């Protein structure tokens, strides 16, 4: 029999006591009272935060939106079909956040940044809160750099700058998405990260957008965030904030970013649905009282940062769909008041063959010529005035039978100016060629060209400048001005093309 010494036993017991650690896990757990329509009412979550993520027994995640005295209103981020009344709910202690990183470029993700393009998980370099504070006044600088859209009508008369928020508004099927996609395609080689957020759209429409971006080699610098029409309202509601969070990751690294929200009308409708189901008091058009804050806190995140914060920028292009051209409805007026200008697309112009169907009279950019290069300022100043006078004269000429020569000339010039602003989809024009086109129009070089040949003439002029006089484009790209030498080259090119046309 072994000799067991009492002091050894006491040592072993003492060691075991020293090693013993009591782990207490405190969890905030509640009980489901009611579930249905993407909403759950939960009892017992006393210490839950507003916007906190909650986990149900079937691993469905929800967001605590309504904190009431006796229960919590939770919106579900999934189907939630296996959630039963009486089942438990656990508070996670986290606010909604997403992974971010350079590996997300070229990918299609859902509003929780999970890939939906069957290419595997991207490597994330960190996480960002979906809802984060907008930069303060001191952290910003005024918009001073242009963000070229490649659309002549916009870059000349409604210029967009880096860090600006420009609303694209119009009825359905007037080319709103086309304007946004052209802008993304035009950023090729400009070192701009683009994010396209599709909210409540058909999966086929999103697939078409992705296919277009791929064909134009624009997907390499673009992230697509898609929440389809059959996704829960919660995902449609958070999709724009996810897009903004992904853009902020690049913005705070000093990069220029462009975010397209297509469209915020559907986000407002999803938020209205959630609010009504949570029994929040309805206001105008049954939207909740904080629907203005829904959009303002999103669009205020767009900014041009000062040099101390890296000088990055986030440009926002929110899209709003109107009903029968009514821009005085609740959501359109809200977003118009938040943004720095709007591009109004008209159904009548679209149907009469003027595409992009931009109504120059109602459209405006509140940043103005600060977002233009000097060459464009030199030629575009007269364009808006000439078009406005032409629109007035055209309306008047429908009643008058005999017009004097000066009026006829002005009408003829206006028709040609309108013609040069027409542009095919997915074919953005570089700024130096836009300058040449507008110069040709406002200085009367097209007055003796047949109206049906104007587009052909413009194409020939662009080709001549590219092939025979490349120094013209080089001069504008480097100096940003239309110098006397460049103007001489342009006049020479116009004469050469005119001779070819008159033969």
UniProtKB/Swiss-Prot annotation:
Short name of any one Pfam family annotated for the protein: ATP-synt_ab
Keyword Transport found: yes
InterPro entries assigned to the protein according to its UniProt record, in alphabetical order: ATP_synth_asu-like_sf, ATP_synth_asu_C, ATP_synth_asu_C_sf, ATP_synth_F1_a_nt-bd_dom, ATP_synth_F1_asu, ATPase_a/bsu_AS, ATPase_F1/V1/A1_a/bsu_N, ATPase_F1/V1/A1_a/bsu_N_sf
Subcellular location: Plastid, Chloroplast thylakoid membrane
GO molecular function: ADP binding; ATP binding; proton-transporting ATP synthase activity, rotational mechanism
SUPFAM superfamilies attached to this UniProt entry: C-terminal domain of alpha and beta subunits of F1 ATP synthase, N-terminal domain of alpha and beta subunits of F1 ATP synthase, P-loop containing nucleoside triphosphate hydrolases
Keywords: ATP synthesis, ATP-binding, CF(1), Chloroplast, Hydrogen ion transport, Ion transport, Membrane, Nucleotide-binding, Plastid, Thylakoid, Translocase, Transport
Transmembrane segments: none
Cited Gene3D superfamilies: 2.40.30.20, ATP synthase alpha/beta chain, C-terminal domain, P-loop containing nucleotide triphosphate hydrolases
This protein's GO CC annotations: chloroplast thylakoid membrane; proton-transporting ATP synthase complex
Reaction equations catalysed: ATP + H2O + 4 H(+)(in) = ADP + phosphate + 5 H(+)(out)
Binding sites annotated in the UniProt record for ATP: 170-177
PROSITE patterns (alphabetical): ATPASE_ALPHA_BETA
Membrane topology: Peripheral membrane protein
PANTHER family in UniProt: ATP SYNTHASE SUBUNIT ALPHA, MITOCHONDRIAL
Family affiliation: Belongs to the ATPase alpha/beta chains family.
Subunit and interaction comment: F-type ATPases have 2 components, CF(1) - the catalytic core - and CF(0) - the membrane proton channel. CF(1) has five subunits: alpha(3), beta(3), gamma(1), delta(1), epsilon(1). CF(0) has four main subunits: a, b, b' and c.
Function: Produces ATP from ADP in the presence of a proton gradient across the membrane. The alpha chain is a regulatory subunit.
NCBIfam families xref list: atpA, PRK13343.1
Protein name, as recorded: ATP synthase subunit alpha, chloroplastic
Organism of origin: Gracilaria tenuistipitata var. liui
Gene designation: atpA
């Amino acid at each position: 029999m072994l000799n067991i010494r009492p002091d050894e036993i006491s040592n072993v017991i003492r060691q075991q006591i020293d090693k013993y650690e009591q782990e207490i896990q405190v969890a905030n757990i509640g009980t489901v009272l009611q579930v249905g329509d993407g909403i759950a009412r939960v009892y017992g979550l006393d210490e839950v935060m507003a916007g906190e993520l909650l986990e149900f027994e079937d691993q469905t995640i929800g967001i605590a939106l309504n904190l009431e005295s006796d229960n919590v209103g939770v919106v579900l981020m999934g189907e939630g079909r296996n959630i039963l009344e009486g089942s438990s709910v656990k508070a996670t202690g986290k606010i909604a956040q997403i992974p971010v990183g350079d590996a997300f470029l070229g990918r299609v993700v859902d509003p929780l940044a999970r890939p939906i393009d069957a290419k595997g998980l991207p490597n994330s370099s960190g996480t960002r809160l979906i809802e984060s504070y907008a930069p303060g006044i001191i952290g910003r600088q005024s918009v001073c750099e242009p963000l070229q859209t490649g659309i002549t009508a916009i870059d000349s008369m409604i210029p967009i700058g880096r860090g600006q928020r420009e609303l694209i508004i119009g009825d359905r099927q007037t080319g709103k998405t086309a304007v946004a996609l052209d802008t993304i395609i035009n950023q090729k080689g400009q070192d701009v990260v683009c994010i396209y957020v599709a909210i409540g759209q058909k999966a086929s429409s999103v697939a078409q957008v992705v296919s277009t971006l791929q064909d134009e080699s624009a997907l390499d610098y673009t992230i697509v965030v898609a929440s389809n029409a059959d996704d829960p309202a919660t995902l449609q509601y958070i999709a724009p904030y996810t897009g903004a969070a992904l853009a902020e990751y690049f913005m705070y690294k000093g990069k220029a970013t462009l975010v397209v929200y297509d469209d915020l009308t559907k986000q407002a409708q999803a938020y209205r649905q959630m609010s009504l189901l949570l029994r929040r008091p309805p206001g105008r058009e049954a939207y909740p009282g904080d629907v203005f804050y829904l959009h303002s806190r999103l669009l205020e995140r767009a900014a041009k940062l000062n040099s101390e914060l890296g000088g990055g920028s986030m440009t926002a292009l929110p899209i709003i769909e109107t009903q029968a051209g009514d821009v005085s409805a609740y959501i359109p007026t809200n977003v118009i008041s938040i943004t720095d200008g709007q591009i109004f697309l008209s159904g009548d112009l679209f149907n009469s063959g003027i595409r992009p169907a931009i109504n120059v009279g109602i459209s405006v950019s509140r940043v103005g010529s600060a977002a233009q290069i000097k060459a464009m300022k030199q030629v575009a100043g007269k364009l808006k005035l000439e078009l406005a006078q032409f629109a007035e004269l055209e309306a008047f000429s429908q009643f008058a039978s005999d017009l004097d020569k000066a009026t006829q000339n002005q009408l003829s010039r206006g028709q040609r100016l309108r013609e040069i602003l027409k542009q095919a989809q997915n074919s953005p024009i570089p700024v130096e060629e836009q300058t040449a086109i507008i110069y040709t129009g406002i200085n009367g070089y097209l007055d003796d060209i047949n109206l049906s040949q104007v587009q052909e003439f413009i194409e020939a002029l662009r080709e001549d400048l590219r092939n025979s006089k490349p120094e013209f484009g080089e001069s504008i790209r480097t100096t940003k001005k239309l110098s006397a030498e460049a103007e001489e080259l342009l006049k020479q090119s116009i004469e050469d093309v005119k001779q070819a046309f008159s033969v």
